[in-house]
Design a protein with these regions (language model features):
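Residue-level detector of alpha-helix initiation sites
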Residues: 14, 18, 153, 259-260, ...
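Glycine-/small-residue-rich beta->alpha transition segments that form the dinucleotide
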Residues: 13-14, 36-39, 251-252, 256-263, ...
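N-terminal glycine-rich phosphate/pyrophosphate-binding loop and immediately adjacent elements
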Residues: 2-127, 279, 285-291, 296-305
Length: 560
Protein backbone atom coordinates (compact mmCIF):
# COMPACT_ATOMS: atom_id res chain seq x y z
CA UNK A 1 0.00 0.00 0.00
CA UNK A 2 1.87 3.07 -1.26
CA UNK A 3 -0.74 5.84 -1.17
CA UNK A 4 -2.27 7.14 2.09
CA UNK A 5 -4.75 4.76 3.65
CA UNK A 6 -8.43 5.59 3.70
CA UNK A 7 -8.54 4.35 7.29
CA UNK A 8 -5.76 3.89 9.83
CA UNK A 9 -6.74 1.59 12.68
CA UNK A 10 -4.57 2.01 15.78
CA UNK A 11 -4.31 -1.21 17.77
CA UNK A 12 -4.79 -4.79 16.54
CA UNK A 13 -6.50 -6.15 19.63
CA UNK A 14 -9.93 -7.36 20.64
CA UNK A 15 -11.76 -4.63 18.71
CA UNK A 16 -9.13 -3.36 16.26
CA UNK A 17 -8.51 -6.65 14.48
CA UNK A 18 -12.22 -7.30 13.79
CA UNK A 19 -12.73 -3.68 12.71
CA UNK A 20 -9.84 -3.69 10.24
CA UNK A 21 -10.79 -7.08 8.82
CA UNK A 22 -14.42 -6.10 8.28
CA UNK A 23 -13.53 -2.72 6.73
CA UNK A 24 -11.16 -4.42 4.30
CA UNK A 25 -14.00 -6.60 3.02
CA UNK A 26 -14.82 -3.56 0.85
CA UNK A 27 -12.17 -3.77 -1.91
CA UNK A 28 -12.24 -0.03 -2.54
CA UNK A 29 -11.27 0.90 1.03
CA UNK A 30 -7.55 0.94 1.86
CA UNK A 31 -7.01 -0.07 5.47
CA UNK A 32 -3.78 0.20 7.45
CA UNK A 33 -3.73 -1.65 10.78
CA UNK A 34 -1.00 -0.50 13.16
CA UNK A 35 0.17 -2.52 16.15
CA UNK A 36 2.89 -1.53 18.62
CA UNK A 37 3.82 -5.16 19.20
CA UNK A 38 4.56 -7.96 16.75
CA UNK A 39 1.98 -9.25 14.29
CA UNK A 40 2.73 -12.98 13.96
CA UNK A 41 1.04 -14.94 11.20
CA UNK A 42 -0.68 -18.23 11.91
CA UNK A 43 -0.71 -20.38 15.01
CA UNK A 44 2.96 -21.27 14.62
CA UNK A 45 3.91 -17.60 14.63
CA UNK A 46 2.77 -17.08 18.22
CA UNK A 47 4.92 -18.03 21.23
CA UNK A 48 3.71 -21.29 22.73
CA UNK A 49 2.90 -19.74 26.11
CA UNK A 50 0.48 -17.32 24.44
CA UNK A 51 -1.42 -20.17 22.82
CA UNK A 52 -1.77 -22.22 26.01
CA UNK A 53 -5.27 -21.52 27.44
CA UNK A 54 -4.41 -23.19 30.75
CA UNK A 55 -2.01 -20.40 31.78
CA UNK A 56 -1.68 -16.62 31.66
CA UNK A 57 2.08 -16.52 31.24
CA UNK A 58 1.90 -13.73 28.67
CA UNK A 59 0.31 -11.46 31.25
CA UNK A 60 3.38 -11.64 33.49
CA UNK A 61 4.91 -8.20 33.94
CA UNK A 62 8.04 -8.02 31.85
CA UNK A 63 6.71 -10.30 29.11
CA UNK A 64 7.35 -8.63 25.74
CA UNK A 65 3.70 -9.09 24.74
CA UNK A 66 2.49 -7.09 27.75
CA UNK A 67 2.44 -3.32 28.31
CA UNK A 68 2.67 -3.82 32.11
CA UNK A 69 1.06 -0.53 33.12
CA UNK A 70 1.36 0.60 36.72
CA UNK A 71 -1.95 1.49 38.33
CA UNK A 72 -3.19 2.13 41.86
CA UNK A 73 -6.22 0.17 43.06
CA UNK A 74 -6.23 2.37 46.17
CA UNK A 75 -3.92 5.31 46.90
CA UNK A 76 -1.44 3.02 48.68
CA UNK A 77 -1.92 -0.16 46.63
CA UNK A 78 0.09 -0.18 43.37
CA UNK A 79 -0.69 -2.88 40.83
CA UNK A 80 0.73 -3.97 37.51
CA UNK A 81 -1.97 -3.91 34.83
CA UNK A 82 -1.52 -6.43 32.03
CA UNK A 83 -2.55 -5.27 28.55
CA UNK A 84 -1.70 -7.01 25.29
CA UNK A 85 1.08 -5.64 23.09
CA UNK A 86 0.80 -8.08 20.21
CA UNK A 87 -1.62 -9.02 17.44
CA UNK A 88 -4.86 -9.98 19.17
CA UNK A 89 -4.16 -7.64 22.07
CA UNK A 90 -5.44 -8.88 25.38
CA UNK A 91 -7.33 -11.74 23.70
CA UNK A 92 -3.84 -13.21 23.25
CA UNK A 93 -3.02 -12.95 26.96
CA UNK A 94 -6.18 -13.41 28.97
CA UNK A 95 -7.88 -16.39 30.56
CA UNK A 96 -9.95 -17.10 27.41
CA UNK A 97 -13.15 -16.00 29.22
CA UNK A 98 -15.58 -15.15 26.40
CA UNK A 99 -18.88 -14.32 28.05
CA UNK A 100 -21.22 -11.80 26.46
CA UNK A 101 -22.53 -8.75 28.23
CA UNK A 102 -26.02 -9.39 29.55
CA UNK A 103 -29.06 -8.14 27.61
CA UNK A 104 -29.70 -5.65 30.42
CA UNK A 105 -26.16 -4.29 29.95
CA UNK A 106 -26.78 -3.58 26.28
CA UNK A 107 -30.18 -2.04 26.97
CA UNK A 108 -28.75 0.21 29.69
CA UNK A 109 -25.96 1.36 27.35
CA UNK A 110 -28.59 2.04 24.69
CA UNK A 111 -30.30 4.52 27.00
CA UNK A 112 -27.11 6.59 26.78
CA UNK A 113 -25.80 5.69 23.33
CA UNK A 114 -28.99 5.08 21.36
CA UNK A 115 -31.03 2.09 20.19
CA UNK A 116 -28.27 0.78 17.89
CA UNK A 117 -26.58 -0.61 21.03
CA UNK A 118 -29.63 -2.38 22.48
CA UNK A 119 -29.53 -6.15 22.93
CA UNK A 120 -31.96 -6.73 20.08
CA UNK A 121 -29.86 -4.56 17.77
CA UNK A 122 -26.61 -6.21 18.87
CA UNK A 123 -27.78 -9.83 18.78
CA UNK A 124 -27.11 -10.25 15.03
CA UNK A 125 -23.58 -8.94 15.65
CA UNK A 126 -23.04 -11.34 18.55
CA UNK A 127 -24.23 -14.25 16.41
CA UNK A 128 -22.15 -13.20 13.40
CA UNK A 129 -18.85 -13.05 15.26
CA UNK A 130 -18.98 -16.57 16.71
CA UNK A 131 -18.88 -20.22 15.84
CA UNK A 132 -20.48 -21.72 18.91
CA UNK A 133 -19.38 -25.35 19.18
CA UNK A 134 -22.12 -26.24 21.65
CA UNK A 135 -25.26 -24.47 20.44
CA UNK A 136 -24.48 -23.92 16.77
CA UNK A 137 -26.80 -21.95 14.56
CA UNK A 138 -29.81 -20.91 16.64
CA UNK A 139 -31.82 -17.83 17.46
CA UNK A 140 -29.15 -16.77 20.00
CA UNK A 141 -25.95 -18.25 18.58
CA UNK A 142 -23.92 -18.39 15.40
CA UNK A 143 -22.15 -21.22 13.62
CA UNK A 144 -19.96 -19.52 11.02
CA UNK A 145 -18.18 -16.63 12.72
CA UNK A 146 -14.42 -16.10 13.18
CA UNK A 147 -14.36 -16.56 16.97
CA UNK A 148 -14.63 -20.18 18.07
CA UNK A 149 -16.48 -20.55 21.37
CA UNK A 150 -16.95 -23.66 23.49
CA UNK A 151 -17.88 -24.59 27.03
CA UNK A 152 -15.51 -26.77 29.03
CA UNK A 153 -16.72 -30.14 30.32
CA UNK A 154 -17.79 -30.02 33.94
CA UNK A 155 -16.75 -33.57 34.84
CA UNK A 156 -13.47 -32.81 36.63
CA UNK A 157 -13.36 -33.11 40.42
CA UNK A 158 -13.24 -29.37 40.98
CA UNK A 159 -15.81 -28.34 38.38
CA UNK A 160 -18.25 -31.00 39.56
CA UNK A 161 -17.81 -29.97 43.19
CA UNK A 162 -18.25 -26.30 42.33
CA UNK A 163 -21.52 -26.74 40.44
CA UNK A 164 -22.84 -29.15 43.07
CA UNK A 165 -21.94 -26.68 45.83
CA UNK A 166 -23.79 -23.89 44.07
CA UNK A 167 -26.80 -26.14 43.71
CA UNK A 168 -26.55 -27.03 47.41
CA UNK A 169 -26.73 -23.33 48.27
CA UNK A 170 -29.83 -23.04 46.13
CA UNK A 171 -28.40 -21.27 43.10
CA UNK A 172 -29.85 -22.26 39.73
CA UNK A 173 -27.89 -23.88 36.94
CA UNK A 174 -26.91 -21.65 34.03
CA UNK A 175 -25.84 -23.95 31.19
CA UNK A 176 -25.44 -21.12 28.67
CA UNK A 177 -23.94 -17.92 30.04
CA UNK A 178 -24.25 -16.40 26.57
CA UNK A 179 -27.97 -17.05 26.47
CA UNK A 180 -31.04 -15.62 28.19
CA UNK A 181 -31.28 -17.87 31.22
CA UNK A 182 -31.27 -16.70 34.81
CA UNK A 183 -27.81 -16.04 36.25
CA UNK A 184 -26.39 -18.98 38.16
CA UNK A 185 -23.66 -21.59 38.10
CA UNK A 186 -22.41 -23.06 34.88
CA UNK A 187 -19.61 -23.47 32.38
CA UNK A 188 -17.71 -20.40 31.22
CA UNK A 189 -17.75 -19.93 27.42
CA UNK A 190 -14.14 -19.73 26.24
CA UNK A 191 -12.44 -18.72 22.99
CA UNK A 192 -10.50 -21.97 22.71
CA UNK A 193 -10.14 -23.92 19.47
CA UNK A 194 -8.12 -26.79 18.06
CA UNK A 195 -7.20 -25.71 14.53
CA UNK A 196 -6.59 -28.28 11.78
CA UNK A 197 -3.19 -29.90 12.12
CA UNK A 198 -2.81 -28.95 15.77
CA UNK A 199 -2.54 -31.53 18.55
CA UNK A 200 -3.79 -29.17 21.24
CA UNK A 201 -6.54 -26.60 21.60
CA UNK A 202 -5.22 -23.03 21.65
CA UNK A 203 -6.34 -19.64 22.91
CA UNK A 204 -8.11 -18.37 19.77
CA UNK A 205 -7.25 -14.67 19.63
CA UNK A 206 -8.66 -12.07 17.24
CA UNK A 207 -5.49 -12.09 15.16
CA UNK A 208 -5.95 -15.76 14.32
CA UNK A 209 -9.70 -15.32 13.93
CA UNK A 210 -9.90 -12.15 11.83
CA UNK A 211 -6.53 -11.05 10.46
CA UNK A 212 -5.02 -14.29 9.21
CA UNK A 213 -7.91 -14.98 6.80
CA UNK A 214 -7.68 -11.38 5.51
CA UNK A 215 -3.91 -10.98 5.09
CA UNK A 216 -3.93 -11.65 1.36
CA UNK A 217 -6.26 -8.75 0.60
CA UNK A 218 -4.37 -6.08 -1.35
CA UNK A 219 -6.28 -3.29 0.40
CA UNK A 220 -5.25 -4.40 3.92
CA UNK A 221 -1.80 -3.75 5.35
CA UNK A 222 -0.91 -5.02 8.81
CA UNK A 223 2.13 -3.28 10.23
CA UNK A 224 3.66 -4.35 13.54
CA UNK A 225 6.29 -2.71 15.68
CA UNK A 226 4.79 0.75 15.13
CA UNK A 227 3.88 2.72 18.21
CA UNK A 228 1.46 5.57 17.68
CA UNK A 229 2.36 8.67 19.69
CA UNK A 230 -0.53 11.04 18.96
CA UNK A 231 -3.25 11.87 16.47
CA UNK A 232 -2.39 14.54 13.91
CA UNK A 233 -5.19 17.13 13.82
CA UNK A 234 -5.45 20.10 11.48
CA UNK A 235 -8.25 22.63 11.66
CA UNK A 236 -10.45 20.31 13.65
CA UNK A 237 -9.89 17.23 11.50
CA UNK A 238 -7.77 14.13 12.09
CA UNK A 239 -5.42 13.72 9.13
CA UNK A 240 -3.21 10.90 10.37
CA UNK A 241 -1.04 9.77 13.25
CA UNK A 242 2.46 10.48 14.47
CA UNK A 243 4.38 7.27 15.17
CA UNK A 244 7.83 6.21 16.29
CA UNK A 245 8.49 5.51 12.60
CA UNK A 246 7.28 8.94 11.44
CA UNK A 247 3.95 10.48 10.42
CA UNK A 248 1.31 8.46 8.61
CA UNK A 249 -1.48 10.16 6.68
CA UNK A 250 -5.02 8.85 6.67
CA UNK A 251 -8.47 9.80 5.52
CA UNK A 252 -9.87 8.64 8.86
CA UNK A 253 -8.30 7.48 12.13
CA UNK A 254 -9.89 4.90 14.41
CA UNK A 255 -8.36 4.40 17.85
CA UNK A 256 -8.66 0.80 19.06
CA UNK A 257 -5.72 0.92 21.46
CA UNK A 258 -7.70 -0.16 24.51
CA UNK A 259 -9.27 1.62 27.45
CA UNK A 260 -5.90 2.80 28.81
CA UNK A 261 -3.90 3.69 25.70
CA UNK A 262 -6.80 5.23 23.79
CA UNK A 263 -7.55 7.96 26.37
CA UNK A 264 -3.84 8.64 26.68
CA UNK A 265 -3.59 9.15 22.90
CA UNK A 266 -6.54 11.52 22.98
CA UNK A 267 -5.14 13.50 25.90
CA UNK A 268 -1.67 14.03 24.40
CA UNK A 269 -3.41 15.02 21.14
CA UNK A 270 -5.31 17.84 22.86
CA UNK A 271 -8.62 16.10 23.46
CA UNK A 272 -9.62 16.03 27.11
CA UNK A 273 -10.39 18.24 30.12
CA UNK A 274 -9.30 21.77 29.24
CA UNK A 275 -7.72 22.62 32.60
CA UNK A 276 -5.70 19.41 32.73
CA UNK A 277 -4.35 19.87 29.21
CA UNK A 278 -3.45 23.52 29.68
CA UNK A 279 -1.57 22.69 32.88
CA UNK A 280 0.71 20.48 30.78
CA UNK A 281 1.11 22.99 27.97
CA UNK A 282 -0.99 21.00 25.52
CA UNK A 283 -3.05 22.96 22.99
CA UNK A 284 -6.72 22.16 23.51
CA UNK A 285 -8.48 20.78 20.45
CA UNK A 286 -11.67 19.62 22.20
CA UNK A 287 -12.67 20.06 25.84
CA UNK A 288 -14.10 16.61 26.62
CA UNK A 289 -14.22 14.43 29.79
CA UNK A 290 -11.67 11.87 28.63
CA UNK A 291 -10.56 9.42 31.32
CA UNK A 292 -12.54 10.99 34.14
CA UNK A 293 -14.82 8.11 35.19
CA UNK A 294 -13.84 4.62 34.08
CA UNK A 295 -15.12 1.44 35.67
CA UNK A 296 -13.61 -2.00 36.15
CA UNK A 297 -14.25 -5.13 38.19
CA UNK A 298 -12.48 -5.28 41.58
CA UNK A 299 -11.72 -8.84 42.54
CA UNK A 300 -10.10 -10.92 45.26
CA UNK A 301 -8.63 -14.41 45.13
CA UNK A 302 -9.79 -16.68 47.96
CA UNK A 303 -6.96 -19.16 48.41
CA UNK A 304 -7.65 -22.69 49.63
CA UNK A 305 -5.89 -26.04 49.81
CA UNK A 306 -7.19 -29.45 48.84
CA UNK A 307 -7.17 -32.65 50.88
CA UNK A 308 -5.89 -34.70 47.95
CA UNK A 309 -4.66 -34.26 44.38
CA UNK A 310 -7.49 -32.68 42.41
CA UNK A 311 -5.77 -30.88 39.53
CA UNK A 312 -6.49 -32.56 36.20
CA UNK A 313 -3.60 -31.97 33.80
CA UNK A 314 -5.87 -32.85 30.89
CA UNK A 315 -8.16 -29.90 31.56
CA UNK A 316 -7.43 -27.39 28.78
CA UNK A 317 -8.85 -24.28 30.42
CA UNK A 318 -7.93 -22.51 33.63
CA UNK A 319 -11.39 -21.23 34.58
CA UNK A 320 -14.08 -23.72 33.53
CA UNK A 321 -17.02 -22.56 35.66
CA UNK A 322 -18.49 -19.50 37.34
CA UNK A 323 -21.33 -18.53 39.62
CA UNK A 324 -23.10 -15.26 38.86
CA UNK A 325 -25.63 -13.95 41.36
CA UNK A 326 -27.34 -10.82 42.64
CA UNK A 327 -26.32 -9.11 45.85
CA UNK A 328 -29.70 -7.43 46.21
CA UNK A 329 -31.67 -10.63 46.60
CA UNK A 330 -29.23 -12.81 48.49
CA UNK A 331 -28.71 -11.83 52.11
CA UNK A 332 -25.83 -13.08 54.27
CA UNK A 333 -28.35 -14.78 56.57
CA UNK A 334 -29.36 -17.10 53.77
CA UNK A 335 -25.84 -18.43 53.55
CA UNK A 336 -26.29 -20.08 56.95
CA UNK A 337 -29.13 -22.19 55.52
CA UNK A 338 -27.29 -23.92 52.75
CA UNK A 339 -30.08 -26.36 52.07
CA UNK A 340 -32.79 -23.71 51.74
CA UNK A 341 -34.37 -23.87 48.28
CA UNK A 342 -35.30 -20.21 48.59
CA UNK A 343 -31.71 -19.02 48.21
CA UNK A 344 -31.36 -19.43 44.49
CA UNK A 345 -34.57 -18.42 42.85
CA UNK A 346 -34.76 -14.85 44.18
CA UNK A 347 -31.05 -14.32 43.56
CA UNK A 348 -31.51 -15.25 39.93
CA UNK A 349 -34.39 -12.87 39.41
CA UNK A 350 -32.20 -9.79 39.02
CA UNK A 351 -29.16 -9.21 36.85
CA UNK A 352 -26.21 -10.64 38.74
CA UNK A 353 -23.67 -8.12 40.01
CA UNK A 354 -21.36 -10.62 41.71
CA UNK A 355 -19.25 -13.39 40.22
CA UNK A 356 -17.27 -16.28 41.67
CA UNK A 357 -14.86 -17.81 39.18
CA UNK A 358 -13.43 -21.29 39.69
CA UNK A 359 -9.69 -21.65 39.06
CA UNK A 360 -8.67 -25.28 38.51
CA UNK A 361 -4.94 -24.65 38.17
CA UNK A 362 -2.74 -23.53 41.09
CA UNK A 363 -1.51 -19.97 41.04
CA UNK A 364 2.07 -21.00 40.36
CA UNK A 365 1.01 -22.98 37.31
CA UNK A 366 -1.12 -20.13 35.98
CA UNK A 367 1.90 -17.83 36.05
CA UNK A 368 4.66 -20.15 34.95
CA UNK A 369 3.12 -23.12 33.14
CA UNK A 370 5.21 -25.44 35.32
CA UNK A 371 3.48 -28.67 36.32
CA UNK A 372 3.74 -31.11 39.24
CA UNK A 373 5.05 -29.48 42.45
CA UNK A 374 5.71 -26.15 40.73
CA UNK A 375 9.14 -25.94 42.37
CA UNK A 376 10.78 -25.25 39.04
CA UNK A 377 8.28 -22.51 38.32
CA UNK A 378 8.96 -20.84 41.63
CA UNK A 379 12.70 -20.93 40.97
CA UNK A 380 12.02 -19.25 37.64
CA UNK A 381 10.00 -16.56 39.38
CA UNK A 382 12.73 -16.00 41.94
CA UNK A 383 15.28 -15.52 39.18
CA UNK A 384 13.10 -12.73 37.79
CA UNK A 385 11.81 -10.84 40.86
CA UNK A 386 10.09 -8.13 38.83
CA UNK A 387 7.96 -10.84 37.24
CA UNK A 388 6.65 -12.18 40.53
CA UNK A 389 3.78 -9.72 40.38
CA UNK A 390 0.60 -11.61 39.90
CA UNK A 391 -0.30 -11.85 36.24
CA UNK A 392 -3.95 -12.75 36.37
CA UNK A 393 -5.23 -9.92 38.52
CA UNK A 394 -2.07 -7.94 39.19
CA UNK A 395 -0.32 -7.67 42.51
CA UNK A 396 1.16 -5.02 44.76
CA UNK A 397 4.73 -5.20 45.97
CA UNK A 398 3.55 -6.05 49.48
CA UNK A 399 1.70 -9.09 48.11
CA UNK A 400 4.77 -10.54 46.41
CA UNK A 401 5.85 -12.78 49.28
CA UNK A 402 2.28 -13.91 49.90
CA UNK A 403 1.90 -15.03 46.31
CA UNK A 404 5.11 -17.05 46.43
CA UNK A 405 4.13 -18.61 49.75
CA UNK A 406 0.73 -19.67 48.39
CA UNK A 407 1.88 -20.68 44.91
CA UNK A 408 0.27 -24.13 45.20
CA UNK A 409 -3.08 -22.81 46.42
CA UNK A 410 -6.25 -23.23 44.47
CA UNK A 411 -8.53 -20.23 44.24
CA UNK A 412 -12.03 -18.95 43.93
CA UNK A 413 -11.88 -15.48 42.40
CA UNK A 414 -14.69 -13.22 43.60
CA UNK A 415 -15.52 -10.08 41.67
CA UNK A 416 -17.84 -7.11 41.91
CA UNK A 417 -19.32 -6.85 38.42
CA UNK A 418 -21.32 -3.62 38.79
CA UNK A 419 -19.25 -1.35 41.04
CA UNK A 420 -20.54 2.03 42.13
CA UNK A 421 -17.05 3.49 42.28
CA UNK A 422 -15.30 5.10 39.33
CA UNK A 423 -11.64 5.56 38.50
CA UNK A 424 -9.65 8.15 36.59
CA UNK A 425 -6.92 8.07 33.93
CA UNK A 426 -4.75 11.15 33.62
CA UNK A 427 -1.45 12.08 32.03
CA UNK A 428 1.38 13.73 33.90
CA UNK A 429 3.35 14.82 30.84
CA UNK A 430 2.78 15.92 27.27
CA UNK A 431 5.32 13.26 26.29
CA UNK A 432 3.36 10.28 24.89
CA UNK A 433 6.09 7.90 26.03
CA UNK A 434 5.40 8.72 29.68
CA UNK A 435 2.82 6.18 30.95
CA UNK A 436 -0.55 7.49 32.14
CA UNK A 437 -1.61 7.59 35.76
CA UNK A 438 -4.35 5.05 36.50
CA UNK A 439 -6.28 5.51 39.75
CA UNK A 440 -8.97 2.89 40.32
CA UNK A 441 -10.35 4.17 43.64
CA UNK A 442 -11.61 0.69 44.46
CA UNK A 443 -13.91 0.02 47.42
CA UNK A 444 -14.23 3.66 48.41
CA UNK A 445 -18.02 3.26 48.37
CA UNK A 446 -19.69 1.39 51.23
CA UNK A 447 -22.06 -0.17 48.69
CA UNK A 448 -19.07 -1.75 46.98
CA UNK A 449 -17.49 -2.95 50.22
CA UNK A 450 -20.71 -4.53 51.46
CA UNK A 451 -21.26 -6.40 48.21
CA UNK A 452 -17.66 -7.58 48.10
CA UNK A 453 -18.05 -8.88 51.66
CA UNK A 454 -21.07 -10.85 50.49
CA UNK A 455 -19.12 -12.27 47.56
CA UNK A 456 -16.25 -13.36 49.81
CA UNK A 457 -18.60 -14.99 52.31
CA UNK A 458 -20.50 -16.74 49.54
CA UNK A 459 -17.27 -18.18 48.15
CA UNK A 460 -16.34 -19.55 51.57
CA UNK A 461 -19.86 -20.97 51.96
CA UNK A 462 -19.38 -22.83 48.68
CA UNK A 463 -16.15 -24.39 49.91
CA UNK A 464 -17.82 -25.47 53.15
CA UNK A 465 -20.73 -27.30 51.54
CA UNK A 466 -21.10 -31.06 51.54
CA UNK A 467 -20.17 -31.03 47.86
CA UNK A 468 -16.64 -29.96 48.78
CA UNK A 469 -16.40 -32.11 51.94
CA UNK A 470 -13.93 -34.62 50.49
CA UNK A 471 -11.97 -31.94 48.61
CA UNK A 472 -11.66 -28.80 50.75
CA UNK A 473 -9.00 -28.82 53.47
CA UNK A 474 -9.06 -25.20 54.57
CA UNK A 475 -8.54 -21.56 53.69
CA UNK A 476 -4.94 -20.43 53.38
CA UNK A 477 -5.12 -16.69 54.03
CA UNK A 478 -8.58 -15.77 55.31
CA UNK A 479 -9.41 -16.54 58.95
CA UNK A 480 -12.83 -17.01 60.54
CA UNK A 481 -12.20 -14.02 62.82
CA UNK A 482 -11.91 -11.81 59.76
CA UNK A 483 -14.74 -13.53 57.96
CA UNK A 484 -17.17 -12.89 60.80
CA UNK A 485 -16.47 -9.20 61.39
CA UNK A 486 -17.27 -6.53 58.79
CA UNK A 487 -14.49 -4.15 59.77
CA UNK A 488 -11.90 -6.91 59.92
CA UNK A 489 -13.07 -8.31 56.61
CA UNK A 490 -12.88 -4.87 54.99
CA UNK A 491 -9.27 -4.58 56.12
CA UNK A 492 -8.49 -8.05 54.79
CA UNK A 493 -10.14 -7.29 51.45
CA UNK A 494 -8.14 -4.09 51.00
CA UNK A 495 -4.94 -6.00 51.72
CA UNK A 496 -5.81 -8.72 49.19
CA UNK A 497 -7.50 -6.59 46.56
CA UNK A 498 -7.00 -7.21 42.86
CA UNK A 499 -8.60 -6.24 39.59
CA UNK A 500 -10.03 -8.26 36.74
CA UNK A 501 -8.43 -5.78 34.31
CA UNK A 502 -11.75 -5.17 32.57
CA UNK A 503 -11.37 -1.42 32.27
CA UNK A 504 -14.16 0.35 30.35
CA UNK A 505 -15.72 3.79 30.03
CA UNK A 506 -12.65 6.00 29.77
CA UNK A 507 -13.90 7.52 26.47
CA UNK A 508 -17.64 6.93 26.85
CA UNK A 509 -20.39 7.20 24.31
CA UNK A 510 -22.51 10.22 25.05
CA UNK A 511 -20.02 12.60 26.61
CA UNK A 512 -16.91 11.96 24.48
CA UNK A 513 -17.99 10.04 21.38
CA UNK A 514 -21.32 9.57 19.64
CA UNK A 515 -23.10 6.28 19.09
CA UNK A 516 -20.90 5.55 16.06
CA UNK A 517 -17.67 6.17 17.95
CA UNK A 518 -17.04 9.61 16.41
CA UNK A 519 -15.19 11.98 18.73
CA UNK A 520 -17.21 15.11 19.43
CA UNK A 521 -15.74 18.22 17.87
CA UNK A 522 -13.12 16.43 15.75
CA UNK A 523 -13.99 15.10 12.31
CA UNK A 524 -12.29 12.05 10.89
CA UNK A 525 -11.58 10.54 14.31
CA UNK A 526 -13.33 7.59 15.94
CA UNK A 527 -12.84 5.30 18.88
CA UNK A 528 -13.77 1.62 18.81
CA UNK A 529 -12.81 -0.34 21.91
CA UNK A 530 -14.15 -0.90 25.41
CA UNK A 531 -13.31 2.68 26.36
CA UNK A 532 -16.52 3.79 24.59
CA UNK A 533 -18.82 1.73 26.81
CA UNK A 534 -20.55 4.01 29.33
CA UNK A 535 -19.50 1.55 32.06
CA UNK A 536 -18.16 -1.98 32.34
CA UNK A 537 -20.54 -4.84 31.54
CA UNK A 538 -21.67 -7.20 34.27
CA UNK A 539 -19.49 -9.91 32.71
CA UNK A 540 -15.93 -9.82 31.39
CA UNK A 541 -15.64 -7.56 28.31
CA UNK A 542 -13.59 -9.63 25.83
CA UNK A 543 -16.58 -10.78 23.78
CA UNK A 544 -18.04 -7.27 23.95
CA UNK A 545 -14.77 -5.79 22.65
CA UNK A 546 -15.01 -7.98 19.56
CA UNK A 547 -18.64 -6.93 19.12
CA UNK A 548 -17.61 -3.25 19.34
CA UNK A 549 -15.14 -3.73 16.50
CA UNK A 550 -17.80 -5.44 14.42
CA UNK A 551 -20.43 -2.82 15.21
CA UNK A 552 -18.33 0.26 14.44
CA UNK A 553 -17.22 -1.40 11.21
CA UNK A 554 -20.91 -1.78 10.32
CA UNK A 555 -21.46 1.94 10.93
CA UNK A 556 -18.45 2.94 8.83
CA UNK A 557 -19.33 0.64 5.94
CA UNK A 558 -22.91 1.90 5.91
CA UNK A 559 -21.62 5.46 5.61
CA UNK A 560 -19.36 4.61 2.68
Amino acid sequence: MTSPADVVVVGAGGAGAPLAARLSEDPGRRVLLLEAGPTPAGVRGFPAELLDPTTVQGAMPGHPANWSYLGHLTPDLPYMIARGRILGGSTTLNGAYFVRARPADFDAWAEVAGPEWSYDAMLPVLRRLETDRDYGDSDRHGSSGPMFVMRPPQASILAAAFTAAARELGFPAEPDKNGLGDPGAGPVPVNVHRPPGSHEAVRWNTGLAYIDPARARPNLEVRGGVRVLRVLIREGRAVGVETTAGPIEAGEVVLCAGAIATPQLLLVSGIGPRADLRALGIDVVADLPVGVAFSDHPDIAIGWRAQRPVVDSRERVAFPAALNFSSELLSPERLSSVHSPSVGSPAAAAEADLEILLAVKPLGYLLTGTAHTLAGGVRTVLRHPLRTLRALIGVSARRMAQQLTHRDDLQLIVALQQPAGRGRITITSADPLVPPQIDYRYLEEEADRSRMRLAVRTAVALLRTAAFADVFDGLTELRDAELGDDAALDAWMLAHLGTAIHLCGSVPMGSVVDSHGRVHGVSGLRVADTSILPWAPSRGPAATAVAIGERVADFMRAQG
